[in-house]
């Protein structure tokens, strides 16, 4: 005994439920995300089988979230879009004033140039990953003497200090960042130049 329900019907019900009920909550969270001074944004390709495009073509899931320093009030929003065009984050971030941490994708910098109230900051994880790839590509006997290895060590020192922030209040974090993290970041950028 059982009931056979076509998966397409179940998918359709899910879409209708989201459009009728969850979209109101999504819009509310989208407005609330503007209350934060620091956001993180990223986009990742997703394969789509329909929607008037070639089967298997790339579309994008854009993700916007509050920074991890807002421990008790995390908001993570996903936005499906058919392309990686700058118009998508431009529309999503139109009322946001603050710092948006990204992976360095040029679209974010294009938007930053259009606005005085938006700053784009680079993501340390993305920078670190590039240096790590370089170090791994080098022969083992040359790794520790490479500039990429030195960059990795400096980024690790920054991470070590940032990891201490997790249990602190926002005020304590700010003080700790100014006293320990900022000098490390300044030293890193002085070294890079």
Regions found by a protein language model. Give the residues of each.
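Catalytic center-proximal scaffold of phosphoryl-transfer enzymes
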Residues: 1-193
């Amino acid at each position: 005994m059982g009931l056979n329900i076509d998966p397409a019907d179940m998918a359709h019900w899910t879409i209708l439920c989201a459009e009728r009920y969850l979209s109101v909550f999504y819009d509310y969270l989208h407005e609330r995300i503007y209350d934060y001074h620091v956001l993180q944004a990223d986009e990742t390709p997703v394969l789509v089988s329909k929607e008037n495009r070639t089967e298997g073509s790339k579309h994008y899931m854009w993700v916007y979230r509050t920074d991890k320093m807002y421990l008790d009030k995390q908001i993570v929003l996903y936005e499906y879009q058919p392309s990686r065009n700058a118009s998508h984050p431009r529309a999503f971030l139109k009322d946001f004033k603050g710092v948006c941490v990204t992976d360095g994708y040029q679209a974010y910098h294009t938007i930053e140039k259009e606005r005085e109230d938006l700053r784009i900051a680079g993501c340390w994880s993305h920078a670190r990953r590039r240096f790590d790839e370089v170090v791994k590509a080098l022969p083992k006997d040359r790794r520790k003497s490479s500039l990429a290895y030195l960059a990795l060590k400096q980024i690790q020192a920054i991470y070590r200090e940032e990891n201490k922030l997790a249990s602190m209040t926002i005020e304590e974090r700010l003080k700790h960042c100014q006293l320990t993290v900022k000098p490390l970041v300044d030293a890193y950028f002085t070294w890079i130049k």
